[in-house]
Design a protein with these regions (language model features):
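Short, surface-exposed ligand- or partner-binding patches at beta-edge/loop junctions that are enriched
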Residues: 78
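Rhodanese-like catalytic fold shared by cysteine-dependent sulfurtransferases
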Residues: 1-32, 39-74, 83-126
C-alpha cells in the first residue's frame, strides 16, 4: 500500500531519537546544530550557531562539510515542524551517523518559546 508523506514521517519517528527543546538547549553546547530547511527559511531566522544543508541535498553534501567528517559526532537536526528533520535523521543513521537526534517541534516550537534566533548566514555549500 502506498504511503503518504505523513506516513513516512511517522515511520521515521519510530527509528530515531526525538528530543524536546530543553534537551536540545542542553545538548547545543557540544553538538552540531543542523538546519535542513530551505535557504530562504534559514535566512529568515534560525537557531544560533546552526548550519544549513537543505533536506533535498543533505545526503549528497553532508560528507563534504568539515564538521561532519566524523560519523560519531553529536548532531541535532531541525526543520520547521520536525517532519523533514525526522526523515533526515533516519537517513543519516542509515549512512552511519550514530549521534543523530531530531528536535521535536522544530524551529516553530523554538521561536514560539521565544528562544534566541539568529539571522546571520551560515549556509554550507550555497
Amino acid at each position: 500500500m502506498p504511503m503518504s508523506a505523513l506516513d513516512l514521517v511517522a515511520e521515521a519517528r519510530t527509528h530515531i531519537t526525538e528530543i524536546d527543546l530543553a534537551a536540545a538547549q542542553a545538548a547545543m553546547h557540544h553538538a552540531l546544530l543542523l538546519d535542513v530547511r530551505e535557504p530562504a527559511e534559514f535566512d529568515a531566522g534560525h537557531m544560533p550557531g546552526a548550519i544549513n544543508i537543505p533536506r533535498g541535498l543533505l545526503e549528497f553534501k553532508i560528507g563534504d562539510h568539515p564538521q561532519l567528517s566524523q560519523r560519531d559526532r553529536d548532531i541535532l537536526i531541525y526543520c520547521k515542524t520536525s517532519g523533514r528533520a525526522a526523515l533526515a535523521a533516519l537517513n543519516l543513521q542509515r549512512m552511519g551517523y550514530v549521534g543523530v537526534r531530531s528536535i521535536h517541534g522544530g524551529f516553530d516550537a523554538w521561536s514560539q518559546a521565544n528562544l534566541p534566533v539568529e539571522r546571520e548566514a551560515t549556509q554550507f555549500g550555497a
